[in-house]
């Protein structure tokens, strides 16, 4: 940037410390450029002045330098003003800051001292030469530390009313925290200063920076020392080129610096991870290894802290290995425990040791939080991968290693909970059991058995679980029962509800419908599910759907349709099951809401097939709606109820089509099967239903197809009886058995059930094995149409009467005049017209609005 623009920047007196820190490098380069420009301009001015004073030269002579001119130039240079270099300017700034700190010490202004101390540390970074700080800086920080200790000692004996104010107290604490950590880097120089301050300040003047030729010589000599470097290994350096020492003594100092820099801008997380990997190699004691592994796992999790990006695969696998190493280390060294609420170790120079009365070395941290975060990162990774690629399958194999970590974490918490003195909260154990349930409840029993066996192989043979013993790992049903019952007894709220839903889902998945149904009804979750979080509501919807599918597999069509009605009838299956984001019209969803919806999506391997779900729902609706429509058509007195509005709309749309082609999808197959079933063609309906390929995705698909064929035969029989009952006097059971290819006993059972439920006006003759229909009960087609017309006319009359009452309400005398005459027909006489006779203005209205007779249409109906 040009120096002319810098002038405007320098005029600004207010700048934050962060800006100074961010732009210190750029300002340094600009100052150097400015110094070079000023020095070059100064030289130009001197040369021009010399030329003006001397005789004016022309031609070639003006480019030649004679002895006289050289002498005059030398004398002028001696009298020129000396220009300070950038380094000298920085030294002046450092001295000014030191003077300010000394002045503030005299008045105990610790707020200003804290600010100036930060500024001083930023300035000294630019002046360090070979890792050595200026001696004036060493003197300043040594004296400041002594002054700090004196002030702290005075504050202990000072009365409360004479202590420092809030601002100075905050500044004092800030300096106390920073100077202790800062002075450790210069401890050798500080000790030398305190030993003999005069000798330290006078001896060994500041070293002059080495010339460039020496640097080039060292660079040229570097290849000769390559072999020696290979033997010794490379040393990691920081941004200033200073070597970073990796030793057991420096581990805690490095970890504290890394922890303090977490969350700050411009933090190189990759570099921090590399440093901690090196620290992990040199860590010797169990305490240091635990601390390094904890910090390393947390730093890897920071790589996936964004809302849209998932954790890199290599870092996830590394975090999984390091977390497994941490659990193994805790299992081996039982005197070290990682628990929440433990006090942080403050002394970076030494590690904690067990005292005579101590039983454990407590390290602050939460193992269950690490496991939950590792699980969440795997879920986010699966969400971002295309499920139809081999990459998704490869990523899914990592679930087995994650399950091993969950089991090891559960065993660790069981072990440390045995000691009541540690006060491990029950919630930690509940959370890790819930994570184990989340990886088991939706899997078939065979898969769970393999998962459990492989997980227990990674555990030492001498370790066992009190909650889920090693011997019971082969029975998936018993495992689910044990885990869920433990959470029923030891948890409440969301975790208890999720455990109950997980067990219901598992039972329904394995065709134990009645157990799942009874648990769902006795839990009363349907009454309080709206008060839970979104994730639990999604699990409730998934469980409800699985119970409905289980009822369908058992042949319970009515129960299946009734269970699936809430989910499938809404038209929002994707959203309710967290398997996709529904396209909303008119921009009803904000980008933030859409982002949250995507974060809630379940991985693809947990999805319930929506096409299969729709097929089951429509098939159940067909088996219930077609007989009902036939019954309503022949018996108008029956209340017109609708079982599935969604199915009715689809059926009406299909019937309005002029030309119907061959079925192409699941919906077309069900609609054409419905049309055939309504016409009594049960074989054709069965063919359409069996042609749906989605049935092959269900276990025991042939048994399901046989069940559907039987259901279609029975509902076809019911539809036939509802439709053609008015045309029969008697009908042989054998005829119906032959027509629908059902056993005569089954036909008799269906007819008897219809008669007992008063759905069919008939009697069953057991001797002749015939159905005798009662005449006069069922209406003819003409009678049905006449009754329908009468109902519509009555509804029209009632609507007109209500409309008239609303319009004339409170206006009985609206047309009366002061002289007693009425408006409209004078004298209140008769008025003919479509409204019939009307009384005078003073006549009372009849009660109930019966004075309005409906006009000509009402007279026609009454006649």
Swiss-Prot record:
Residues 822-839 have a biased composition (Gly residues). Residues 16-53 have a biased composition (Acidic residues). Residues 840-850 have a biased composition (Low complexity). Keywords: Cytoplasm, Initiation factor, Protein biosynthesis. Transmembrane segments: none annotated. The keyword ATP-binding does not apply. Component of the eukaryotic translation initiation factor 3 (eIF-3) complex. It comes from Chaetomium globosum (strain ATCC 6205 / CBS 148.51 / DSM 1962 / NBRC 6347 / NRRL 1970) (Soil fungus). Residues 79-92 have a biased composition (Basic and acidic residues). It holds the Pfam family eIF-3c_N. Residues 604-778 form the PCI domain. Its main location: cytoplasm. Component of the eukaryotic translation initiation factor 3 (eIF-3) complex, which is involved in protein synthesis of a specialized repertoire of mRNAs and, together with other initiation factors, stimulates binding of mRNA and methionyl-tRNAi to the 40S ribosome. The eIF-3 complex specifically targets and initiates translation of a subset of mRNAs involved in cell proliferation. This is Eukaryotic translation initiation factor 3 subunit C. Signal peptide: none annotated. GO terms for cellular component: eukaryotic 43S preinitiation complex; eukaryotic 48S preinitiation complex; eukaryotic translation initiation factor 3 complex, eIF3e; eukaryotic translation initiation factor 3 complex, eIF3m. Residues 1-92, 808-863 are annotated as: Disordered. It is found in: Cytoplasm. Coiled coil: none annotated. Disulfide bonds: none annotated. GO terms for molecular function: RNA binding; translation initiation factor activity; translation initiation factor binding.
